[in-house]
Amino acid sequence: MGESPGLHPYCHGASEATATLDMIRAVREAQALGEIPGMEPDNGELFLTGYSQGGHAAMATHKYIEENNLLEEFNVIASAPCSGPYEITGAMADTILAASYSNPGYIVYIMASYQRVYGDLYTSYSDVLKAPYDEIVEPYFNGNNYTLGMGSLNEQLPQEIQSFVEDSVLENFLAASDDLSHPIWQAMAANDNHDWLPTRPIKMFYCTGDEQVSFQNALVAESTMLENGATDVEAVFKGEGMHNDCVLPSLTDAFTWFESLKTACSLSIEYLEIGDVEVFPNPIQNTFRIETEDFLNSNVSILDQSGRVVYEHQDLTPNCEIDISNLTSGCYFLMLNNVNKSITIKLIKA
């Protein structure tokens, strides 16, 4: 599941955190070497967000930074985890153990991930999964899967955990619900990230109709952190939508919150001179124009909030008009690039 080689360590906090920090270090190094033309100077402020597993990753990264005394290197101004499984042993366990769970593939995914990391959950899928499901799941998690997706796996698994997990495994797992002595419980507990004391602001966005990741994760994390002594932690209600409905309102509000907290970069005169671009109207109904002299003949790209390119245009002409009527409402980023410089401008599609 994914283009990188090997099995992705799903919801393994340490992997999520170290991969994120290594990525930031790599970008800073590339910037220092001048390998990212037109990139704004790094002012040292870090904002963390992510959705679903990305919410778990954002929380894990923030937690890792604070608990390993890395705030001097990674100055977290705020984090905004969205719809993430922060309390895996509680709110998430209650969800997947319910009478019916709409995304049973996640259950196998997390077992496969923790088996890869800890190595003590099983020796083969037949140890933990009933036939024929032990053979069905193998191609999804063999580390060489580039085409099979979670939707396909969910369609092939029953929505009742007792229908595909071996009876003895489930019985032993449930029997250890109080002391968490079962290896699967221990792996889950090692990746809970709701019970710690953040010193930097956190907002956790959630929707109450989320059928994949219980909104109780955010509420439990909020209450636990406040009990631990945190002073700036909040679970933020974003409506009654389901998991996919909650993406845009959550990430849009996270971005808006970050915008209110950031410090404007102290840009050089040279940088200000290359930023002579006018976009109007903005917010945009259907079309907008770009007026510029500095970026004529540039390549034009529009990215959504996940970084996906949703529009491309080459060779920018004077007073160019761009039609984005096919895009849904929300926040986007206009990027203009030529051989010498680049600029990014926030767009709001009404």
Task: Place the predicted regions along the sequence by residue.
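Short alpha-helix in the alpha/beta-hydrolase fold that links the catalytic acid
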Residues: 61, 200, 214-224
